């Protein structure tokens, strides 16, 4: 049964969040009456208002108005005044993933999960399906540059969504195709143990219907181990691994583009199909891997090589994924969301592939608990940066933890052998260092999930002043 149009006003608490805003936008496009609130004005709130969606700034009981349904994310606390008011009025309170699941019932769906790479892979799947004329509906965890938004309503039969595993609610999503990019020990505050994370991803794949499939990256040992435990669902594997059903090889850089080949082997017939010299306008093996996942999905949906080739070549990227924010004296400045050691290592490796110059990495650790739990990994993930500048921890509402700090991370980086790791107290220290240390052809890469993105956009202007 599809969600009826008669459910009344749907109120989103935290409507400006990247996940919530996309769902609200698609609901509105489908003709539902949508409104919401957020703590602060942001670009997502502005965009929703421009589409005719009422968005309050600040949380208050009276914001609910005539709401009949309230949607919340896991970030909303039980003492939030709108949550309290909804409880008092006995309104249905719906989790973000549950509302996303309701939207997915309108279409056949591809859900992209994994610890890293979800947003980019979701965008790539959408790009290929677009190029193949399938006109998908898309709900993503990041702004897709070609759309200028994280969500769009398509006229086709398919929906492409990012499946956020952070609170376990991704298991509610009724996907026909489930993609897993990788599995690392993240969100242990919710799951309690890595074994429970593994089990959640197994269930994610086994939740697809018998006519669906899992698309899984066997370059990652945890995912390869999971493949052997999937007993009753069809699986297509991908990666650089020689055993992959959809395998990329011969990856190289040409004029800032990744160029690579893809070999597709059918399990039943052992037939082989090769696509040579595919071009992706972004660097990095991890991005080629994500593109291979998208190719695996597109191939399963019957798309031809020409459409795949066209979709990859035209891929416009995702905001905050190695996004160029400006240049100064031949120095390129990038903004990236990477805040986990695996992501940081992949981004810096991609930067190293893309330039023969020096790389200055500017990192803002995100959450004290993450820095504590992955301290050794953070101490070893900056090897591809010539200089590392570490800013104070972005707490994201957490309290400090004794002995866990950016200064401690810098000391650990130096102890592990990094030749130029420094602590910086804030953004005001960056421009003088870049002026002194950087030369034409160098990259400056900002890394983090906090407000460091504002620094990345401010630096080009500061350098020019």
Curated annotation (Swiss-Prot):
Primary location group: cytoplasm
Classification via Pfam families: Mur_ligase, Mur_ligase_C, Mur_ligase_M
Residues holding ATP: 114-120
Entry's Gene Ontology cellular component terms: cytoplasm
Biological pathway: Cell wall biogenesis; peptidoglycan biosynthesis
Annotated catalysed reactions: UDP-N-acetyl-alpha-D-muramate + L-alanine + ATP = UDP-N-acetyl-alpha-D-muramoyl-L-alanine + ADP + phosphate + H(+)
Compartmental location: Cytoplasm
Top-level EC class: ligase
Entry EC no(s): 6.3.2.8
UniProt keyword DNA-binding present: no
GO molecular function: ATP binding; UDP-N-acetylmuramate-L-alanine ligase activity
Assigned protein family: Belongs to the MurCDEF family.
NCBIfam families xrefs: murC (TIGR01082)
Function, in words: Cell wall formation.
Name of the featured protein: UDP-N-acetylmuramate--L-alanine ligase
Organismal lineage: Bacteria, Pseudomonadati, Pseudomonadota, Alphaproteobacteria, Hyphomicrobiales
């Amino acid at each position: 049964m599809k969600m009826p149009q008669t459910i009344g006003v749907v109120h989103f608490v935290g409507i400006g969040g990247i996940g919530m805003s996309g769902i609200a936008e698609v609901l509105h496009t489908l003709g539902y009456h949508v409104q919401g609130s957020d703590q602060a004005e942001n670009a997502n709130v502005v965009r929703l208002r421009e589409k005719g969606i009422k968005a309050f700034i600040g949380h208050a009981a009276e914001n609910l108005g005539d709401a009949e349904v309230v949607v919340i994310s896991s970030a909303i606390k039980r003492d939030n005044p709108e949550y309290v008011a909804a409880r008092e009025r006995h309104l249905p309170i719906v989790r973000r993933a549950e509302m996303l699941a309701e939207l997915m019932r309108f279409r056949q769906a591809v859900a992209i999960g994994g610890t890293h790479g979800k947003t980019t892979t979701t965008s790539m799947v959408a790009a290929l399906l677009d190029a193949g004329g399938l006109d998908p509906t898309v709900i993503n965890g990041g702004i897709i540059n070609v759309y200028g938004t994280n969500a769009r309503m398509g006229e086709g039969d398919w929906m492409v969504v990012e499946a956020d595993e952070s609170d376990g609610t991704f298991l509610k999503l009724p996907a026909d195709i489930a993609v897993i990019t990788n599995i690392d020990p993240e969100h242990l505050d919710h799951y309690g143990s890595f074994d429970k994370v593994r089990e959640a991803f197994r269930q994610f794949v086994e939740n697809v219907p018998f006519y669906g499939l899992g698309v899984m990256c066997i370059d990652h040992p945890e995912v390869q181990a999971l493949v052997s435990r999937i007993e009753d669902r069809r699986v297509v594997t991908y990666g650089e691994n020689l055993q992959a059903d959809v395998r990329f090889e011969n990856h190289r850089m040409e004029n800032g583009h990744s160029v690579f080949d893809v070999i597709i082997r059918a399990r039943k017939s052992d037939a082989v199909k090769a696509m040579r010299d595919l071009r992706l306008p972004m660097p990095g093996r991890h991005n080629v891997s994500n593109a291979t996942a998208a190719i695996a999905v597109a191939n399963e949906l019957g798309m031809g090589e020409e459409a795949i080739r066209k979709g990859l070549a035209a891929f416009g990227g995702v905001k905050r994924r190695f996004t160029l924010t400006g240049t100064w004296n031949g120095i390129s400045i990038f903004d990236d969301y990477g805040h986990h050691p695996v992501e940081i290592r992949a981004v810096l490796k991609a930067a190293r592939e893309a330039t023969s110059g020096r790389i200055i990495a500017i990192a803002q650790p995100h959450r004290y608990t993450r820095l504590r739990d992955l301290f050794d990994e953070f101490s070893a993930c900056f090897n591809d940066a010539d200089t590392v500048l570490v800013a104070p921890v972005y707490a994201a509402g957490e309290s400090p933890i004794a002995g866990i700090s950016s200064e401690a991370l810098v000391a650990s980086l130096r102890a592990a052998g990094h030749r130029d790791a420094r602590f910086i107290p804030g953004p005001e220290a960056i421009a003088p260092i870049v002026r002194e240390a950087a030369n034409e052809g160098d990259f400056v890469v900002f890394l983090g999930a906090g407000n460091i993105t504002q620094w990345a956009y401010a630096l080009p202007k500061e350098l020019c002043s």
